[in-house]
Amino acid sequence: MNKIKNLKNSTILYLSLIILLSLTFTFYSGYRGIFPIDSFLIFDAGFKILNGYQPFKDYWSITGPFLDYFQYLFFKMFGVNWTSYVLHAGTINIILSLTTFYFFLNIGLKKIHSCIYSISIAILGYPSVGTPFMDHHATIFSLLSLMTLILALKKDYYYYWFSLPLLLGFSFFSKQIPSAYLSILFLITILIYLAIKKFRKISNVIYLFYGFVSLILICSSIIIINDIPIKNILTQYIFYPISIGKERSLYLNFNFNNIFSQFKFIYFSLLPLIFPIYYLIKIKVKKYQNLIDILILFTFLLSVIIFLYSQLMTKNQILIFFIIPFCLGMTHYYIINYCKNKKLIFLLLFLIIISTLKFHIRFNIDKKFMELSGVDFSLAQPGQILDQK
């Protein structure tokens, strides 16, 4: 009885710590400098909806209607002020961090390790920008959808299948990529999964369809209630971004720095996977769980490639370094299940500490994502000079 009580208390302690750090780092970053266009983009959109304007109908919108409506809700509940704006980002950061903790616990990592990876994500996730931003929302919800798919493949619970289309939809309506690419990959993964199960137990996958229908109903309700023309949505959110994407893809620079150097810590986090992959290949008679783990491994690695490609397509500062803790956590899972080398676990923990410190300094303190590197923050003026809110 005391053991159960201690377990509950330790879980509550971990969850409280993750929530506290998720909010603290986001608020620290959100109040540390602004970049006029990017910092106020979603603020303005949420304020427009609060005043009766609708995206696509009353103002041009090529990215982020999900953010616009979500920010509207925060303004409605907490008032039009910077605190409710940063709280929006902090809330998403909490969701990401807590889901990461839950995910790693459910695939078999210890609480302390799950907590370490979750805290790292809490520090490197939304704090890199500090205020709501479409690229962060899109990448975060895409990462959440990847976690959900992995849990669905391992646990086969209906609520994971149901949630998957919703999370992909939230990501897509934050920004079109990476969810558009991930949807294709996930569909292929699900078909292979069904083939492994010989199409016998597909009842839970039906909930995937229910989730998709629910997403369609939510979107349709918003469109009908607000009388938003479908033609405007297609023009602004589908056709125009496709034309931009085609042009950008033609001029992508696949040099060493773009492909390898700037993402080296992501590759470092994946490098130890060589050992469990070797052991997986050596297994002559692969059991059902081995096949599922192989499927998850390839889906995970291809998803990382999609995240990298999407980052290159944004032509923006790098934001995906918060997938490093996730990559290390996945590597951790395969090591303890197929390699069982404690030295490699210490290597992973060393990498998580180094990468978290490095990118916390670069993005949260120096604010590189907001183009504020080298700025003397001692000369900063309080925002109340412009507006008390």
Where is each model-derived feature located?
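Hydrophobic alpha-helical membrane-interfacial segments at the cytosolic entry of transmembrane helices
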Residues: 13-21, 199-225, 266, 342-355
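Extracytoplasmic catalytic/substrate-binding loops of multi-pass membrane glycan-assembly enzymes
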Residues: 30-45, 56-71, 80-83, 228
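Transmembrane-helix signature of polytopic, membrane-embedded enzymes
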Residues: 100-124
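Membrane-interface transmembrane helices that cradle and orient dolichyl/undecaprenyl
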Residues: 106-108, 145-162, 171, 199, ...
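Short acidic/glycine- and proline-prone juxtamembrane loop motifs at membrane-interface regions
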Residues: 130-138
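Specific aromatic-rich, kink-prone transmembrane helix
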Residues: 138-155, 160-169, 187-194, 326-330
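Membrane-interface alpha helices of multi-pass inner-membrane proteins
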Residues: 160-178, 182-187, 301-312
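Hydrophobic, aromatic-rich transmembrane alpha-helices
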Residues: 264-293, 297-300, 304, 329-334
